[in-house]
């Protein structure tokens, strides 16, 4: 944490959310009123240099603009007493209603509840994405996931999807064990013990193939 990314003030915070589309702008084609959507706080234009190489998180066209507190067109859609209020991560989910770029909207399966869908936009995308796209996990690999919070638990699920043979969850809080195991971990190690030694022991003295 360096403090290099500082949100401007005043702003409406919140970067995870889901809800129902109630209205759309005249040029919107991806969603319509009544659609149930999860919100993605790192949208992409899908046509730039990085997007064409499947590196959507590096897209400069939309992402860099929204980090300044404005919409993709450089304007704010929130105001109070005639004064603009900045957006946060392009979606500002701590509000009853939000104005977001259509690129942020991911249409939901009707059976997915909003409280589950809300965390998909950051915690799940980050953790599962780390396992599937950054970890380069091969079937049968041993994987250690350090931290079993929302992102870590999602990484555990991602490692399971990648068919890792051994998934070791490491966390300071013993109460995280059962949920970690339920979501795919094969072992749980308390971080306040000799965690490194135990992980090495569990992997036959070799250490894990992948650490997240």
Regions found by a protein language model. Give the residues of each.
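Mid-domain Rossmann-like dinucleotide-binding core that forms the NAD(H)/NADP(H) cofactor-binding site
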Residues: 96-97, 103-105, 109-193, 197, ...
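Phosphate-coordinating loops and pocket residues in cytosolic domains that bind phosphorylated ligands
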Residues: 53, 61, 182, 190, ...
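Residue-level signature of the cytosolic catalytic core of signaling kinases
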Residues: 13, 90, 110-112, 191-192, ...
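Glycine-rich beta-strand-centered segment in the early N-terminal region that forms part
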Residues: 2-52, 57, 65, 107-111
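A glycine-rich helix->loop->beta "capping" turn
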Residues: 202-210
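NAD(P)H dinucleotide-binding glycine-rich loop of Rossmann-like/cofactor-binding domains
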Residues: 6, 47-146
